[in-house]
Amino acid sequence: VPPREIVAIAQRRFTKPVELRRTHPHYENWKPSLYGPAFYETIYMAPSYQLGSLAQGSGGDWRGFSLQVTKNNDSINGLTVTAERPHVIAQSKNLLIWHGSETPQLSVPDAQVERIDGITFLTYDQTWIAVHPFDRGFALEIGDPQTHVGLVPFKRFVTARARLVVDAHRVQYRASNGSTLT
C-alpha cells in the first residue's frame, strides 16, 4: 500500500493553485549521448483548469502543450494547438508564450469567443482565457475566480494592463497583474 501522501497527490487532493516543474529522462538514457533530461515540463494546476507545456514544444510522439478546462458538469474541454514546424514554449503559472516558425492553429471547443482590441477572450464556466496572437504564435493569460473575481474584471484588467512585445530577438508578455514572461 503506498503512503497516503502519494495517494493524495495521485488523486490531486492538495491546495490549488500549484505549479510543478519537472524533467523527464530520455527513453534510452543508458546511451552516453543521451545524458541529462529529455524534456523540461511545467504544469500549473488551478481549481478549474490545468495548463502544461514542454519547453521545446511538440514533436515526434509527444505533445508540448496541454490546456484542460473543467466545466460545471465535471466534463473537460481541451484547447488544442496544431503546428507542423518546430516551436518553443515559455510558461510561468497561468501565463504561456507559444513561439514557432509558422502560425499555429488553435481549436477551441465549446468556448464563448469575443474579440476586444486584438485580444481573443475564450470563456468557459469558471475559466477565462485571453489569447494575444502574433505572427508566429500567441501569448495566453488564464484567469479564474481566485485570480480575477469574475469575467468582467478579467477582461478589463487584461485590456487595460496586459502588453505583448514581439521583436526580432524575443517575445515578452506583461500580464494584467504586472508579472512578465519572456
What is the predicted role of each segment?
Residues 1-182:
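Ser/Thr/Asn(+Pro)-rich, low-complexity disordered segments
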